[in-house]
Amino acid sequence: MAFISFPPRHPSSSARLPLTLIALDDWALSSITGVDSEKYIQGQVTADVSQMTEQQHLLAAHCDAKGKMWSTLRLFRERDGFAWIERRSVREAQLTELKKYAVFSKVVIAPDDERVLLGVAGFQARAALANVFSELPNSENQVVRDGASTLLWFEHPAERFLLVTDVATANMLTEKLHGEAELNNSQQWLALDIEAGIPVIDAANSGQFIPQATNLQALGGISFKKGCYTGQEMVARAKFRGANKRALWLLAGKASRVPEAGEDLELQMGENWRRTGAILAATQLDDGQLLVQAVMNNDLEAESVFRVRDDANTLHIVPLPYSLEE
């Protein structure tokens, strides 16, 4: 029996989110297995995976030779290698790039659509899951395994959980939470990632930005001490020569439409508007508010006013839950 996804509804902000079970159809799972898996992935991503424990997950970037990101990967260890979660729209291209040198290593790199990705967030999320699983992850142990399930813990914008599980467990959880939790699709998890300042790289923005332009250094996603990896020279230059002039920003406000990934925004300059930045992701909440995640210049004034191109409404900067100070 397959897992049936949930119908869409407008997402809520983390502050007002009732207990919600979220089908993460817009995200996709992949894995690398084999005796060379750690060495291989270490040579391809920005984070130091050799330092990762079984109880950690981290966000890393997979870059091209120029340091531009194919994708960001949410990495965690599995029994005989690693698994990662990324946006479904970039998975195929990202795996093609990752496999380019695999012929020289004892590894198997593959998409995994057998397992189901679910999010649990909102009011009393921990209590709801405690009725189902014997152990839950937390700030100390961010990854917990329970039977066929791997549970990942997220702190921001409010405590939430990502489940990598089999179809039977996904259906069982849906049944157990029936009547207690609201059901929603990927847009709700996307809204929470936007609030949390976690970069969302979809196909429209793949190959466009170095990791620092999306704040990955502030999220622990770049090691400047590890050995070489694809794109390392450009990523290091951006840090040590101050070559990066961009950052990821969170904007909120109103607009008559939800802009697409890859669109630009407009910045108010006196009585005029100037095109700026690139949108990574946007979603409209159930209260009508628009949330936008965008890469723009890193020296913007906090009071800057923006708008979706040619729109009558405006957007403003919202502080992120982490600091960009190094």
Curated annotation (Swiss-Prot):
Q: Which InterPro entries match?
A: GCV_T_N, GcvT/YgfZ_C, tRNA-modifying_YgfZ, YgfZ/GcvT, YgfZ/GcvT_CS, YgfZ_barrel
Cellular component terms per the entry's GO annotation: cytoplasm
**UniProt main location, coarse:** cytoplasm
Give the GO molecular function terms.
Answer: folic acid binding
GO BP terms, alphabetized = iron-sulfur cluster assembly; RNA modification; tRNA processing
Name the residues that bind folate: W27, W189
Going by the entry's taxonomy, the superkingdom of the source organism is recorded as Bacteria
Q: Where in the cell is it found?
A: Cytoplasm
Which SUPFAM superfamilies does the record associate with it?
Aminomethyltransferase beta-barrel domain, Folate-binding domain
Q: Which UniProt keywords apply?
A: Cytoplasm, Folate-binding, tRNA processing
Family stated for the protein in its record: Belongs to the tRNA-modifying YgfZ family.
User: Entry's HAMAP family?
Assistant: tRNA_modifying_YgfZ
Question: What is the purpose of this protein?
Answer: Folate-binding protein involved in regulating the level of ATP-DnaA and in the modification of some tRNAs. It is probably a key factor in regulatory networks that act via tRNA modification, such as initiation of chromosomal replication.
The protein depicted here goes by the name tRNA-modifying protein YgfZ
Protein species of origin: Salmonella schwarzengrund (strain CVM19633)
